[in-house]
């Protein structure tokens, strides 16, 4: 070894000695791996439905001002959104608090003390009044003021890892806010279209009740004329009572939905006025392939991902705690026993201090903290993997439901057309004078019943379409 390489080796020896003297780090837990969804999720939907990812404001496709207003009000005033926003602000403040520990700190301090020295204590000579010896005791008024600086050197990256962990939490909270936003929008839209479905069903039931009343009036007239017996009108009366009961049930459901909408949108009035509109037929959106794209379009998956990243940085910070901790301190002050001497140049004092903390034996505290960080990280990864599996299953389940309901709607549409043909035949026979008008009403009631069934199926299809939109991320994009 030559002289040029000998001196650097000697200089590094104390550092190597310090590192060797640190508390030993034990690897007791194995990290889990993050799961990714399959490259493709086969939904077996018609090609017409595979027309891309939903838009971030997918509810605008309904072209319904009432719905848009309700969702905008919910996103602006709902308590859930306020909670999500405050969680982000809290995480940002915590990240800033950790980041400030990585820089130098400078403080100014000043103090004044009036004290009487004890002649029997350690400072006994200062209790004497001997100007020749420089003492003017026993009373002194001493003062100190000046600057104090400190700097914790983050050589091993502990503070940087903690800041990264906090920033990961901020990003996770932001993704959770978007998830809350989509859940709110989806909940409001589902309730709104459920209300519209019940409103349309109410109209059909009123038409059924009208036809039943026509039949009842005809039967009563025939009975009064002695043409029929009273027994023939009993079944119609029972059916009319059932229809009235259904109307009451529908009215109750509509009021419950209105109350839930008021709660979701944080509406300030006790009642909510909605106008009935026709149920739309909006094509559900489903891309041909999901795979990795689903990870970037589901806010809940992004939140879980950032919690994993945050936990990994927490592990780095826990590992850095095993290494020496170095602090620098400096002060520049004026210090005097008498206030009259405080501003003299001779009262100035200054100094620099370098501190080193070396963890040698800590009864396993550092390893316990590291185990906690690793366990929390594995828990975050396991939660992420679970969320990935559930996300893929949500899409597959919602897509299958949309397909099934689409087929049911097609079959129901054919049933309604057949029922209308029966009504047309009855109307033609009535126009020809072959049957009475009550027989036309009897033919209309089954057709109206099928129309009611069709409305319920259409409402279910709309609800499933909104659930599919939510399963696809609701337009969220990283």
From Swiss-Prot:
Q: Which UniProt keywords apply?
A: Antibiotic resistance, Cell outer membrane, Lipoprotein, Membrane, Palmitate, Signal, Transmembrane, Transmembrane beta strand
Q: Which gene encodes it?
A: mdtQ
Briefly state the protein's biological role.
Answer: Could be involved in resistance to puromycin, acriflavine and tetraphenylarsonium chloride.
The record's comment on protein family reads: Belongs to the outer membrane factor (OMF) (TC 1.B.17) family.
The way this protein sits in the membrane is described as: Lipid-anchor
Signal peptide positions on this chain:
1-21
InterPro entries, A to Z = OMF, OMP_efflux, RND_efflux_OM_lipoprot_NodT
Indicate whether Signal appears among the record's keywords: yes
Lipid attachment (S-diacylglycerol cysteine) is at 22
Q: Name one GO biological process term.
A: response to antibiotic
Q: Where in the cell is it found?
A: Cell outer membrane
Q: What is its main location?
A: membrane
Residues with lipidation of kind N-palmitoyl cysteine? 22
Protein's name in the database: Multidrug resistance outer membrane protein MdtQ
Task: Read off the NCBIfam families from this record.
Answer: outer_NodT, PRK11459.1
Q: Care to name a GO molecular-function term for this sequence?
A: efflux transmembrane transporter activity
**Annotated Gene Ontology cellular component terms:** cell outer membrane
């Amino acid at each position: 070894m030559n002289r040029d390489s000998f001196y650097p080796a000697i200089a590094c020896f104390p550092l190597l000695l310090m590192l060797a003297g640190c508390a030993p780090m034990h690897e007791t837990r194995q990290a889990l791996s993050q799961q990714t969804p399959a490259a493709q999720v086969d939904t077996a939907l018609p090609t017409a439905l595979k027309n891309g990812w939903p838009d971030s404001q997918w509810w605008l496709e309904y072209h319904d001002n009432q719905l848009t207003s309700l969702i905008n009000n919910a996103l602006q005033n709902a308590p859930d959104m306020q909670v999500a926003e405050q969680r982000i602000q809290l995480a940002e403040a915590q990240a800033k608090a950790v980041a400030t520990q990585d820089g130098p700190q400078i403080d100014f301090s000043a103090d004044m003390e009036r004290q009487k020295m004890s002649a029997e204590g350690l400072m006994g000579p200062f209790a004497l009044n001997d100007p020749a010896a420089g003492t003017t005791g026993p009373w002194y008024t001493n003062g100190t003021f000046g600057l104090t600086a400190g700097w914790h050197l983050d050589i091993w990256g502990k503070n940087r890892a903690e800041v990264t962990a906090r920033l990961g939490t901020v990003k996770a909270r932001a993704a959770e806010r978007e998830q809350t936003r989509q859940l709110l929008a989806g909940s409001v839209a589902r309730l709104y279209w459920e209300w519209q479905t019940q409103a349309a069903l109410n109209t059909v039931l009123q038409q059924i009740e009208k036809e039943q009343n026509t039949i009842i009036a005809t039967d009563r007239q025939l009975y009064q004329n002695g043409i029929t017996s009273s027994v023939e009108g009993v079944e119609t009366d029972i059916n009319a009572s059932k229809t009235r009961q259904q109307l009451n049930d529908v009215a109750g459901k509509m009021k419950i939905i209105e109350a839930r909408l008021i709660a979701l949108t944080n509406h300030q009035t006790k009642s909510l006025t909605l106008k009935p509109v026709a149920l739309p037929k909006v094509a559900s959106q489903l891309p041909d392939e999901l795979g990795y794209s689903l990870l970037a379009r589901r806010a809940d998956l992004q939140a879980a991902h950032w919690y994993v990243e945050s936990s990994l940085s927490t592990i780095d910070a826990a590992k850095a705690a095993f290494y020496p901790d170095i602090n620098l301190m400096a002060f520049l002050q004026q210090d005097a026993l008498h206030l009259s001497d405080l501003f003299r140049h001779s009262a100035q004092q200054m100094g620099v201090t370098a501190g080193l903390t070396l963890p040698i034996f800590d009864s396993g505290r550092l390893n316990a903290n590291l185990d906690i960080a690793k366990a929390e990280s594995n828990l975050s990864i396991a939660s992420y993997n679970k969320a990935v599996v559930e996300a893929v299953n949500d899409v597959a389940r919602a897509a299958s439901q949309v397909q099934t309901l689409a087929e049911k709607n097609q079959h129901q549409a054919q049933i309604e057309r057949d029922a209308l043909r029966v009504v047309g035949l009855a109307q033609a026979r009535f126009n020809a004078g072959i049957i009475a008008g009550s027989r036309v009403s009897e033919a209309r009631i089954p057709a109206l019943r099928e129309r009611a069934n069709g409305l319920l199926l259409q409402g279910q299809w709309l609800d499933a379409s909104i659930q599919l939109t939510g399963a696809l991320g609701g337009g969220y994009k990283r």
